[in-house]
Regions:
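Membrane-water interface segments at the C-terminal ends of transmembrane alpha-helices
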Residues: 1-106, 130-155, 178, 187-210
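Short cytosolic juxtamembrane segments of multi-pass membrane proteins
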Residues: 209-218
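The alpha-helix within a helix-turn-helix
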Residues: 116
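Glycine/proline-centered hinge or cleavage motifs at structural transition points of membrane proteins
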Residues: 119-121, 133
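Short coil/turn motifs that cap or connect alpha-helices
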Residues: 36, 122-123
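Short, conserved catalytic or interaction motifs in soluble domains
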Residues: 49, 110, 162
Length: 218
């Protein structure tokens, strides 16, 4: 179990960290800008939430396989490696981070940003000194939800990464494997770990959201 747990936590943490830069960029664009193609980006971001995870995994398999456009371009194997696990987790958890961060950015009073601009601050400085700190709690909540989603990812992972013990067998895949083998006791033990991690992540995320909406007293 420890090997499965360590692999799952490492890949989920890496996937969460890797989606932060593009996730925040997408969330900020959706929250603060009106531009041609915005609705297309909104749709693309939401797709992994509504598509069957296995369908997403099949798309990744075709893209990342040795005969796929991305696979041919890369000089190393991706499919059926821990890299495929990370990519599947990234794709499936990306929408949660974007949606949560977008709400956090939208709740930042634009007057603060405008005031900083009138004082000569650049867009980058406004973002890093005004927008980002004020939206930080919501962003952290989004990261926690994305991490929890990555921990529970199964459909896309099993298709693009498979079930290779010690290399691609994550917590969700291990639960499925134990059930298939009739080892229900082990499956329920793994299930308990998965539920505990998910509960802790969601509870903490909700705590950040609640604190963000609490009135501040001087």
């Amino acid at each position: 179990m420890s090997e499965v747990l360590v692999l799952t936590l490492r890949t989920a943490a890496l996937a969460t960290l890797l989606i932060v830069p593009p996730g925040l960029a997408a969330a900020w664009l959706l929250a603060r800008r009106r531009w041609y193609g915005k609705s297309l980006l909104e749709t693309l971001v939401a797709l992994p939430l509504v598509m069957p995870p296995v369908a997403t995994g099949l798309i990744l398999l075709k893209l990342l396989g040795k005969r796929g456009p991305v696979g041919r371009w890369l000089d190393f194997d991706v499919v059926f490696t821990w890299r495929a696990v990370v990519i599947a987790m990234m794709v499936m958890s990306f929408p949660l981070l974007v949606r949560t961060a977008r709400v956090a950015f939208e709740e930042v009073n634009p007057r603060f940003e405008q005031l900083a601009r009138t004082l000569g601050a650049s867009e980058w400085r406004v973002f890093f000194t005004i927008t980002l700190p004020l939206a930080a709690r919501g962003i952290v909540a989004g990261m926690l939800l994305a991490f929890a989603r990555a921990i529970g990812e199964f459909g896309a992972t099993i298709l693009v990464a498979g079930n290779i013990p010690g290399r691609t067998t994550t917590l969700a895949v291990a639960i499925y494997d134990r059930v298939q083998l009739g080892r229900d006791d082990e499956a329920f033990q793994l299930l308990g770990v998965a539920v505990a991690i998910a509960f802790a992540a969601v509870w903490t995320a909700e705590a950040f959201v609640r604190r963000r909406h609490e009135p501040r007293h001087s």
